A protein has these predicted regions:
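Mid-to-C-terminal alpha-helical segments outside catalytic/metal-binding sites
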Residues: 2-60, 110, 233-240, 248-283
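Hydrophobic faces of well-ordered beta-strands that scaffold small-molecule active sites
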Residues: 8-12, 61-63, 91-94, 120-122, ...
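Amphipathic, non-transmembrane alpha-helical secondary structure
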Residues: 46-54, 73-80, 84, 102-113, ...
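Active-site-adjacent C-terminal substructures of enzyme catalytic domains
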Residues: 187, 194-252, 260-265
Length: 283
């Protein structure tokens, strides 16, 4: 079935063997907990990623750039060039540091113009001092939100507790309430379910037409029962499937969705249709 649906992954990153040593110390313990320490140590090649997509029945991924404290594990330029080279397989999500002010603002604009970027990826835990992050309603984000609304691209934010040894309080979903009220034209997704505050994230997505819940880094087998029911009923139009590849594999996350027993239409929305609409991939 997954091959027919043609899944779209809302959050994945390619960290090549040449860049795998750049992961900061605060991340390695979570790679061990997920049982993928060696995967991250070795990195992945583009060919490996494409093969794994094919084997899992994943048609396309939102290929996210990832930069942490200046270390470009996958730069906007790298992600953008891959998206241009393989437009049927990748759409690009750029990333910027909102602390960089107008430099970040213009970088978003560049990525849209040069690479047809479809989303901005933000990780609030990264924009602080390592103990306190910057919640999504911090006004330093607002020029970026305005630019994304103007350019008609989405914003996907890491919401919930962090896996890395970095601050989590800034990931409370309620901070998105103010953002959604201020920018009703902006398409917003809270990534990683927002756990352990997933009930709040689910309610925000139900409340606001422009807010969605994204599932990356959370294996479907372990999704809370309330979220499984949400995907099958009252929230089925507001959920985006993702992996946070290579943290979770494409095949595992597709297969485990298959095992949830969702209605076919709900499953199709989760794996593909909602992402097509949210990221405007058919435009």
């Amino acid at each position: 079935m997954s091959e027919k649906v043609g899944a779209i992954d809302a959050w994945a990153t390619l960290i090549t063997p040449e860049k795998s040593h750049l992961w900061p110390d605060s991340f390695w313990h979570i790679f061990k907990r997920y049982g993928v320490y060696e995967v991250f140590r070795k990195g992945k090649t583009l060919e490996q990623m494409l093969q794994e997509m094919e084997e899992a029945g994943v048609d396309k991924i939102i290929l996210s750039a990832f930069v942490f404290e200046g270390e470009e594990l996958c730069s906007n330029t790298e992600a953008g060039k891959m998206a241009l080279k393989y437009p049927d397989k990748f759409a690009m999500a750029c990333t910027v540091d909102p602390r960089h002010g107008m430099k970040a603002y213009y970088e978003v604009e560049r990525c849209v113009k040069e690479y047809n970027c479809c989303a901005l990826r933000l990780e609030p835990y990264a924009y602080g001092n390592g103990k306190v992050g910057a919640p999504p309603n911090d006004k330093m984000y607002y020029p970026l939100y305005a630019k994304c609304a103007e350019l008609d691209i989405a914003v996907v934010l890491q919401i919930g507790h962090t896996g890395p040894l970095l601050p989590s309080e800034c990931g409370r979903p309620i901070y998105l309430d103010e953002v959604a009220l201020t920018f009703p034209e902006l398409r917003i997704a809270g990534a990683h379910l927002g756990q352990p505050w997933h009930e709040e994230m689910m309610t925000l997505a139900w409340k606001f037409p422009n807010v969605y819940v994204e599932t990356s880094a959370r294996a479907p087998k372990f999704w809370p029962d309330s979220f499984k029911a949400y995907c099958n009923s009252w929230g089925q139009d507001k959920v985006l499937w993702g992996t946070d590849y290579p943290l979770l594999s494409f095949k595992r996350c597709v297969d485990e969705v298959e095992d949830l027993g969702l209605k076919f239409e709900a499953k199709k929305k989760l794996l593909r249709d909602n992402a097509m609409r949210f990221f405007k991939l058919g435009a």
